[in-house]
């Protein structure tokens, strides 16, 4: 009986704390100035639930952002203003890994609405099954609102690599980026 009462008390306490915390977070973040980064990976690929978003939910996400006080942050502006204090509410959209489903599902929406984003690309899987091609990546990077970002070569857990292996991975990606798109992306997203 004592254990049941203690468990009930803990449950009620946690419930009340979380209710207050959520209310306090809403009050706090509604006045926040700065950048929120929202990261996506796969689109309409239900076989990968941990990294997938259904396209109707993605569209809803974009509509919520458009109707909020936040504005989309163009990656080129973000790059220039990186070290400056952020005085406006901004959303930075990022897409990791260059999956083909991004190109087929989300890219047409972002292109139509001219919504800025960063596409972080690991060079090793490009063109393989389920991934974008270099022509598709170049198309995104050549747009006014899509920016290509660096995501390593292998997309391995770089923390498990030696310093020399880490440097070789990045240098290999740099060389491929230069060959395929003509430049090395300035923005880097650490894999995992």
Q: Locations of the language-model features?
A:
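Bacterial N-terminal signal peptides
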Residues: 5-15
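Metal-dependent polysaccharide deacetylase catalytic core of the NodB/CE4 family, i.e.
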Residues: 33, 38-48, 87-91, 100-192
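Noncatalytic alpha-helical scaffolds and linker/capping helices
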Residues: 96-97
